[in-house]
Amino acid sequence: MEHLVDINDVESEEIEQLLDLAASMKENPGEFSGVMDNKSLVMLFAKPSTRTRLSFETGMTQLGGHGIFFEMGSSQLSRGEPISDVSQVMSRYEDAIMARLFEHDEMMELAENADVPVVNGLTDFLHPCQALTDMFTMQEKDRLDTLAFVGDGNNVAHSLMQASAKMGVDCRIATPEGMEPDEEIQDRVSDANVTVTNDPYEAVDGATAVYGDVFVSMGEEEQREEKLAEFDGFQIDQDLMDAARDDAIFMHCLPAHRGEEVTAEVADGPQSVIFDQAENRMHVQKAIVHTLVNQ
């Protein structure tokens, strides 16, 4: 595994090893406190973030390394410097690059020109760190069986489909008509137990984990009212949760908009694991960066 840009490029065995390492790092943090000593991770941001920056930066500190925040808007990138040049320069200074970008093509260009590992912190097409964290959280809660995602067939759904296919998870994606996942992703997982439906109750039936995401993604604010209308009937409320397995967990990549994609009763209820899930981002990402840098 040279980079983590796309889960499709990672073998199932490598994912299992990453999740095992993340579990060890979470359970015994002291054993890993110096494994990234004198190592640096540059964190390239084109999109605002809370969890991505905090989890990567704190994770590097816990491993004895250093995270460097780099905002594209205040750099020469905003004045037209090619991302391929920036990638090569960063490779001379840093031990790894994490990027949170809009365009997936830019992420691929970054990785293609880097001489150090590149980690995809998010693009509009994929969110691999989140999906691997979700597999870890389901495994930690003994719910790594059937995942129902209710929302937009976007980057999170794409990576969940791919991660589920790699891990043998029964994955159901419920979206309004016209918002289904990209056909390229559906083709990639066509041999796996991944289904797409326009009926949230069909998706949730018997699921061990029910997953929500925002109805209005970053950059879609002007379409807010239109998007909310299209998602009518897709809110995750207690009635929908009751259609899942009795011990199902509720997951969300955050930020959550209570009263839109999920009710407060569910988001803050006993089935919710959203803050365990948020914490686990840090541990899984520590495992990813450590593995890539020290392999």
UniProtKB/Swiss-Prot annotation:
It is found in: Cytoplasm. HAMAP family: OTCase. Its EC number is 2.1.3.3. Keywords: Arginine metabolism, Cytoplasm, Plasmid, Transferase. The gene is arcB. Not stable below 1 M KCl. It is an enzyme of class 2 (transferase). Optimum pH is 8.8. At the physiological pH of 7, activity is only about 30%. The keyword Transferase applies. One of its GO terms (molecular function) is ornithine carbamoyltransferase activity. Arginine lead to a slight activation. Inhibited by all nucleotide phosphates. Homohexamer. Pathway: Amino-acid degradation; L-arginine degradation via ADI pathway; carbamoyl phosphate from L-arginine: step 2/2. Belongs to the aspartate/ornithine carbamoyltransferase superfamily. OTCase family. It holds the Pfam family OTCace. GO terms for biological process: arginine biosynthetic process via ornithine; arginine catabolic process to ornithine; citrulline biosynthetic process. The keyword Transferase applies. This is Ornithine carbamoyltransferase, catabolic.
